[in-house]
Amino acid sequence: MARYVFITGGVVSSLGKGIAAAALGALLQARGYRVRLRKLDPYLNVDPGTMSPTQHGEVFVTDDGAETDLDLGHYERFTGRSATKTDNITTGRIYKNIIDKERRGDYLGATVQVIPHVTNEIKNFVTEGNEDYDFVICEIGGTVGDIEAMPFMEAIRQLGNDLPRGTAVYVHLTLMPYIPAAGELKTKPTQHSVKELQALGIHPDILLVRADREIPEAERRKLSLFCNVRQSAVIQALDVASIYDVPIAYHKEGLDNEVLAAFGIEPAPKPRMEAWEDVAHRIRTPEGEVTIAIVGKYTGLKDAYKSLIEALYHGGIANRVKVKLEWIESEVFEKEDPAPYLEKVHGILVPGGFGERGSEGKINAARFARERKVPYFGICFGMQMAVVEAARNLAGIEKASSTEFGPTKEPVVGLMTEWVKGNELEKRSAAGDLGGTMRLGAYRAALKPETKIAGIYGSPDISERHRHRYEVNVDYKDRLESCGLVFSGMSPDGVLPETVEYPDHPWFIGVQYHPELKSRPLDPHPLFASFIEAALEQSRLV
């Protein structure tokens, strides 16, 4: 039978509930337990797929094609378990399900209300499909007191009574701010947060307290007394240099022991932390440094590229080097020469994006990388712009463009209207809804033998996650290949280009998919490991 850990947050947002949940999952896994992580998001969007990256951050795509919260990326990176569409739900999805049921008459004429209908829908989501797991960790988005989160709080309160005795534990993540004028850490914000949580009927078993310095024993006793929590269950969560230090730090503070003790599991099996200790050691003791320029459209909010950033760091871990990131807004290169910005970097990465804004800057970045022999990694939109650059400057197709930007006589990149998924043909139209209508999730690709990318993967058959509407037009394949750009990977049916590369370039690869979504600190993605290795070689030349 699965045991449930509910993680809530208080005082302020962005305290790191997702990292805390992921780290706890990793610690329980290290003890041999089977762990599942789920995220409950209070916003009214059905999913984050149509939300602005500069407002919500990255949209994390699962193998089965769900557009989910970026915290699911943390869950995957820390536990190695691939998430599914059933691991994330929003208020919007819950209400949509309920309204659909009401329209079908499933409620048999009953008045549909928050209690019991909304709360039951939430409870069903939390408890379904957990037969194969020992622990289910549920993160509740937002902060205690948010009006949007109230149905979720009520649902997890009810679950405390619905589930068998001793199978639900509540962890509350709070902030203990340091006041310089007083020269001390303050407990009052945490006290008020717990008081508000208790007013909702939820009594936390464990307090996970964020702080930028050691919490004195006297302050722990104070929190224990006023928050009605065992002193041993007041766990300090101190700031660390890397998020991959968090599992070790939480284990040192006894979080996993306290969770298991709250479930009555004593003595608990000892954790195997060697892999995490090796990662932490590699991060602390790099043997070199490389600088990677990220030429993007959403550089104002780094969370828009969360998985990408982490995948680059994973490449650094694989090569025992520190990865320094230079963020460049792509629009800059539409007005200025890229050379002063890019001459000193060791690699250029152009990530995914949508829309015409900044596209010419990305094209100019690709041209600089091609001509100057600087390692270039184009992902999704970054691959498309590299192909447009080749079409214009190598194949002489001056009007080469993407139909995403409007009508064009030379649609080197165009809207996909149909593609094969499994054994079924999927179709889309330009007039269709934006939400959930892209080519989403894991698709297979066939790599051309003897190409650089096939050598990196070590296999001609790969599966990677996609999120795009537009695709390089296969009708231009022969003209582009005659100019030196090799289409090194195609969809199994040979219709959709998946990867491109220049054989005469040290490292120039474009991919239509998002390899960053499958990279892990304990298992770096081969493309990122190879890209950073190429950047390391470049650093010796600059």
UniProtKB/Swiss-Prot annotation:
Allosterically activated by GTP, when glutamine is the substrate; GTP has no effect on the reaction when ammonia is the substrate. The allosteric effector GTP functions by stabilizing the protein conformation that binds the tetrahedral intermediate(s) formed during glutamine hydrolysis. Inhibited by the product CTP, via allosteric rather than competitive inhibition. GO terms for cellular component: cytosol. Disulfide bonds: none annotated. Pathway: Pyrimidine metabolism; CTP biosynthesis via de novo pathway; CTP from UDP: step 2/2. GO terms for biological process: 'de novo' CTP biosynthetic process; pyrimidine nucleobase biosynthetic process. Catalyzes the ATP-dependent amination of UTP to CTP with either L-glutamine or ammonia as the source of nitrogen. Regulates intracellular CTP levels through interactions with the four ribonucleotide triphosphates. Belongs to the CTP synthase family. This is CTP synthase. It comes from Sinorhizobium medicae (strain WSM419) (Ensifer medicae). The gene is pyrG.
